Amino acid sequence: MISILFVAGGTGGHVIPALNMADYIAQKAPHWKISFVGRKDSFEEGLIRGKYDFYGLNISRSSDVKKLSYYLSISDAIKILNEVKPDILVVFGSYITVPVIIASIVKKYPFFLHEQNVVPGRVTKLFYEFSEGVAISFPETREYFRDKSKVYLTGNFVKTELLTMDKASCKKELGFDENRKLLLITGGSQGAMKINYEVKKIIPYLLDKGWQILHQIGEKNYVRYIEEIPIEEWIQKGYNPVPFIRNMELAICGADFAISRAGATTISQFLIAGLPAIYIPYPYAKDNHQKYNAELVVKVGGGELLLEDQLSSQKLLHLLDKWNDEKRLAEASEACKKISIATGRENFWNLLLEKLEGRN
């Protein structure tokens, strides 16, 4: 029986692709043992525990290599490896993964890295030469690695079943009019106060222009936001504000245009679905990786880049008027699809089999 250990945590951008890949492997090889390492008492533990074996590490972003707790995390990681005895690890670079990578190198356990962003993160660049290889989501990422023999273009690990459904059917299932354009607004799973604040000023105008709107507010800000708007009037015109979109793939499938952050998984989903967007990168993302993700899409005509320090309701209104055009939307949708990779999980599965067979 093959044992595979996923290492992911810190953000949904790392955890969701890991879960997507684990689910794919569980379908392809139900006899394989799948386990996860993440942070103890974290959101990823809540997502994963009960579905797959989960091992928690006591580590935070503020952990320092000079502190004893950091070395204890490496020691704990070694204990986990001794218990799980994985045939291979799949690592999604973030601070949580470093003790496990070091433990894997010390104990000589092979590992793959997966890079979701266009510009690879520090963990990926630091450790890829010790790995079996790094699977990348975009061809442009290859240029950031000196040893290109270890770099494999797979695509991101995205569930594509809903993303490629008929748009009208998705709108209908979401409760919207299938004959009207749908605007998706999301500041990520936690929402984004600045985006919400500027969007709120132009909702009446957008509704009058014929847009329907699905707006993910964020659970933390939802009650206050709802109290500040004429909710009943806007809902009647086609506005649906929600704390959290439970089925984001369905929402992406049904949308004609979006206002969004530029996380790697979000962008991969948008490209596969052919969804153009105004991208407002999260300004505090490490190494500004969301900006580089967005620039790749904008370069091919798949949307617009709007930095948060330049964000205003007037600029949003100008851009949305520009994109309220059937021909422009159709051309941008095709441009997105042309650079998408919808077979990321299948590609990595084949790579994994090849490497495992080569070791036997």
Swiss-Prot record:
InterPro entries: GlcNAc_MurG, Glyco_trans_28_C, GlycoTrans_28_N. The keyword tRNA processing does not apply. It is found in: Cell inner membrane. It is a peripheral membrane protein. Keywords: Cell cycle, Cell division, Cell inner membrane, Cell membrane, Cell shape, Cell wall biogenesis/degradation, Glycosyltransferase, Membrane, Peptidoglycan synthesis, Transferase. UDP-N-acetyl-alpha-D-glucosamine binds at residues 11-13, 117, 189, 245, 290. GO terms for cellular component: plasma membrane. Pathway: Cell wall biogenesis; peptidoglycan biosynthesis. It comes from the Bacteria. One of its GO terms (molecular function) is undecaprenyldiphospho-muramoylpentapeptide beta-N-acetylglucosaminyltransferase activity. Signal peptide: none annotated. Its EC number is 2.4.1.227. It catalyses: di-trans,octa-cis-undecaprenyl diphospho-N-acetyl-alpha-D-muramoyl-L-alanyl-D-glutamyl-meso-2,6-diaminopimeloyl-D-alanyl-D-alanine + UDP-N-acetyl-alpha-D-glucosamine = di-trans,octa-cis-undecaprenyl diphospho-[N-acetyl-alpha-D-glucosaminyl-(1->4)]-N-acetyl-alpha-D-muramoyl-L-alanyl-D-glutamyl-meso-2,6-diaminopimeloyl-D-alanyl-D-alanine + UDP + H(+). Transmembrane segments: none annotated. Belongs to the glycosyltransferase 28 family. MurG subfamily. Cell wall formation. Catalyzes the transfer of a GlcNAc subunit on undecaprenyl-pyrophosphoryl-MurNAc-pentapeptide (lipid intermediate I) to form undecaprenyl-pyrophosphoryl-MurNAc-(pentapeptide)GlcNAc (lipid intermediate II). This is UDP-N-acetylglucosamine--N-acetylmuramyl-(pentapeptide) pyrophosphoryl-undecaprenol N-acetylglucosamine transferase. It comes from Dictyoglomus thermophilum (strain ATCC 35947 / DSM 3960 / H-6-12). The lineage of its organism: Bacteria, Pseudomonadati, Dictyoglomota, Dictyoglomia, Dictyoglomales.
